[in-house]
């Protein structure tokens, strides 16, 4: 296992920051088509930073999906997803993370059918050069839990999962059971803390000062033979600036205890 972080500043300053933090890689997350096109256009400069710093791009992802509407996969949007996937391959990433939005105009069956077509298109384009992983984040993505995985993943044996325990915890699901049952399909893991008080979520502090049972998380990862990367996700409005930088170092020290 290696430890890195999400870093959407992929200029020389962003790469230098990650290197100075003592981390091994960056993950780039694109939250819309504009951000995806920006990365596609910057692929040569990003590759130059990889060579300069020795910090690689472990994963590229697309969040907040708009890939289907009116019962069909949008071909123009699909091209951007495929170009982003090609960029991830060009940069040497290990995984490409995506999801698919739910189309309210069609049936659940048709949504599942379109999801299978969509992920199969990505898998075919990858052609074994990179792992395709579905995110368990709910942000304009409906393929996020065992209910959907049980339908889609058996149809696509090469489709993996990008797992974040905090997402399951925040929807009151059993993240340890999900990891135990589906651990062999996990290709990439987000390290993000989350804290609840009573029935309300409070914040997403650094992992290690949160509610997630990270010891059990790692016990399950080891039991399922996980050898993928661990990506710190800063995700708190409170932990910003100097406090945010200190939080990254806190998480790094905490998580490294489990990396045997």
Would you name each region that the model predicts?
Residues 27-50, 100-107:
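Glycine-rich, proline-tolerant flexible connector loops at the mouths of alpha/beta enzymes
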Residues 32, 65-74, 208:
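The substrate-binding groove and active-site-proximal loops of carbohydrate-active enzymes
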Residues 42-53, 118-125, 178, 216-220:
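Catalytic-core regions built around general acid/base machinery
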Residues 49-52, 69-160:
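Active-site acidic/histidine proton-transfer and metal-coordination neighborhood
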């Amino acid at each position: 296992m290696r430890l890195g972080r999400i870093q959407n500043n992929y200029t020389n300053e962003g790469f230098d920051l990650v290197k100075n933090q003592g981390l091994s890689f960056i993950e780039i997350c694109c939250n819309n088509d504009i951000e995806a096109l920006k990365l596609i256009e910057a692929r040569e400069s990003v590759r130059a930073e990889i060579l300069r710093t020795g910090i690689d791009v472990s994963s590229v992802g697309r969040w907040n999906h708009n890939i289907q509407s009116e019962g069909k996969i949008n071909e123009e949007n699909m091209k951007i997803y495929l170009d982003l996937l090609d960029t991830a391959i060009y940069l040497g990433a290990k995984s490409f993370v995506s999801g698919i939005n739910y189309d309210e105009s069609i049936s659940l069956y048709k949504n599942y059918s379109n999801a299978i077509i969509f992920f199969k298109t990505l898998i075919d384009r990858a052609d074994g050069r990179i792992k395709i992983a579905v995110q368990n984040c709910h942000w304009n993505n409906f393929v996020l839990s065992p209910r959907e995985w049980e339908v889609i993943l058996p149809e696509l044996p090469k489709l993996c999962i990008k797992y974040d325990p905090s997402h399951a915890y925040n929807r009151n699901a059993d993240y340890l059971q999900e990891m135990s049952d589906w651990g062999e399909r996990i290709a990439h893991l987000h390290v993000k803390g989350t804290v609840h008080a009573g029935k309300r979520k409070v914040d997403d502090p650094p992992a290690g000062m949160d509610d997630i049972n990270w010891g059990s998380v790692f016990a399950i990862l080891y039991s399922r033979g996980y050898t993928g990367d661990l990506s710190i996700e800063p995700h708190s409005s409170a932990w910003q600036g100097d406090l945010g930088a200190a939080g990254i170092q806190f998480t790094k020290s905490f998580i490294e205890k489990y990396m045997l």
